[in-house]
Amino acid sequence: MKAIINIALLVCTGLLNPVFSQETGTFKSQQLKNKRVKDAYATKWSGLEAELKAKKISPNAMEVFVRIFKKEKELELWVKNKSDAKYVFLKKIAVCASSGELGPKRKEGDYQVPEGIYDIASFNPNSSYYLALKVGYPNKSDKILVDGKRTGGDIMIHGNCVTIGCVPLQDDPVKDVYMLCVEAKNNNTSPRIEIYPCKFTAENSKYLEENFDDGKNNFWANIKPAFTYFEANKTPAKFSINTKGAYVFSN
C-alpha cells in the first residue's frame, strides 16, 4: 500500500512522464501520434461521435464543460456547438477513488482535491496512469488563499483508481473525457472545469452547514452561485477574482 501511495504522489506532483507540449500541426494530429490516444480513437471514437450527433453536436465546432462533485464522486460532461447558447448534458462518469475531505486545497501535501473554477492546463497522453488532463490549479483565488507559501500543483484527471489529490477514473471512461477535451482544444476552445464539494441541494447544504466550519462554509457560499447559475441557464457563470481571493460573479 505504501508503494502504491508513493507512486500516486509522483503522479499527482507531475514527477512521472512529462506532459505533451508539441505545437506543430493541429493539436489533434499531434495527440494521435501517441499510442494510447490512437487506441482510444480506434476503439471508442465512433461510439462517442454517435452520442454527440444524437445531441446534434458537431465535433468540429464543439465546446466542452466539466463538473466534478466530490461527495457524489461524479464527473459530468456537458457539450455544445460554438454557435449554441446552452450546453447539453452528455454523460456522467464515476470518480473511482478519492482522498482528503470536502473543502478546497489550501497547501502542498494536504491530499485535497481543489474546489473552484479551472481550465485544462495541459494534456499527458503518456501518463503512468494511462491518460491524464492537468487541472489549472492553482488559480488566482488559490494563490491568494494559500495556507503558507506552497500551494502544491499538478492535479490531474487521470486513469486508474489510486489518488492522493487527483481525480481518478477507470481507464475506459477516461478515454471519453480525454478525446472530448482533445476535440475541444483542437477547436481552439479551452474546456472549463468546475469542482464542487457536492451538488448544492437543500439536503446537502444542510449537511455542509452542520458538519463543517465557518471557513469552509463561507468559501462554499462564495462558489455556490456558479453552480446555481449553470443549473438554471446551462451556461457557465461569468466571473472574476478579487484581491481577497473571492469569486465575483457578473451575470
State where each predicted segment sits:
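N-terminal post-signal-peptidase region of extra-cytosolic proteins
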Residues: 47-65, 77-79, 97-108, 113-119, ...
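Short Gly/aromatic-enriched secondary-structure transition segments
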Residues: 81-96
